[in-house]
């Protein structure tokens, strides 16, 4: 059994980035993958910001470091991922993600910040030794249907990422 850890960097529940994570996790074979979802908005701000490392934060860091596949997900604020995600990854030791694959997921209101995933989140996780999937996911408002379901382009991006995961771990 392989471990996949999704890290939600949005300060709000039911965000678009969380919806994408749920679609990915629901598509992974549960007989092959044990999934953990870490919602950073639920971890104490003192632990995250003051690095006091309470038990909940320690457990989240350890689960992430031990994961085979990591899915950090964040909305785009000021052309980059959230501070929640930043302070979480800042607490990891150098090279702590060596050998782990990462599928970055980022959402925004428009395609204008689509390169922010490549200029922000990707270098951050690579600095910790992670191997980044080629099929990262950046989705914006127009890629969702009016009923809130994922549109065809978003489904296609998710499917491309799932196929890459299957090739890596198949």
Name each model-derived stretch.
Residues 1-6, 101, 138-146:
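A short small-residue
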Residues 1-92, 152, 156-169:
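N-terminal beta1-alpha1-beta2 submodule of the flavodoxin-like/Rossmannoid cofactor-binding fold
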Residues 31-33, 98, 133:
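Residue-level signal for beta-strand positions within conserved beta-sheet cores that form or flank
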Residues 46, 111-112, 145:
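A short beta-to-alpha transition loop/helix N-cap that caps and shapes the active-site region
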Residues 69, 101-102:
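C-terminal basic regulatory modules in eukaryotic proteins
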Residues 94-98, 128:
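Short, conserved loop/helix-junction motifs that constitute active-site signature segments
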Residues 102-140:
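Short, glycine-/small-residue-rich phosphate/pyrophosphate-handling segment
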Residues 126-170:
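A charged, well-structured terminal subsegment
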